[in-house]
């Protein structure tokens, strides 16, 4: 039985976790982004975290999430796009993406989340799961390997 390309994404305030079903691994990256002159992305994830508090005045290291909420939609989109590309260089044809989302989102947050998930996924299969990545990885593994 061939296992499809399935990835689970848990977008947290401080870390982003990406679960790869084929490799059975969870990649953890810091939810940070380094920006030069408020327009050019310099580093994302753990690389941006290493730059935190050691950057010149024209480079700003920020966390695009605040208190479990999306603070900057464009920066979250850039972080997810970069981390997904970094973790899934050889995704193959039309992978399935599962997102762990909070249950108590406002309508504006829900729309912004759906928007950048659609941008990132390029029309692939999308699913939203209202649980954390540990439960989520157990569900996916037990579902696809049974």
What are these regions (language model features)?
Residues 1-13, 17-29, 34-42, 46-146:
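Nucleotide/phosphate-binding catalytic cleft detector across ATP-hydrolyzing
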């Amino acid at each position: 039985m061939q296992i499809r390309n399935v990835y689970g994404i848990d977008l947290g305030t401080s870390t982003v976790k990406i679960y790869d079903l084929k490799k059975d691994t969870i990649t953890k990256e810091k939810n940070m982004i380094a920006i030069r002159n408020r327009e050019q992305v310099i580093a994302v994830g753990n690389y941006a975290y290493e730059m935190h508090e050691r950057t010149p005045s024209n480079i700003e290291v920020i966390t695009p999430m605040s208190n479990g909420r999306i603070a900057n939609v464009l920066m979250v989109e850039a972080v997810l796009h970069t981390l997904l590309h970094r973790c899934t260089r050889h995704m193959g044809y039309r992978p399935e993406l599962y997102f762990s989302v909070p249950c108590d989102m406002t309508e504006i947050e829900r729309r912004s989340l759906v928007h950048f998930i659609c941008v990132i996924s390029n029309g692939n299969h999308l699913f939203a799961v209202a649980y954390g990545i540990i439960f989520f990885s157990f569900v996916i593994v037990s579902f696809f390997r049974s």
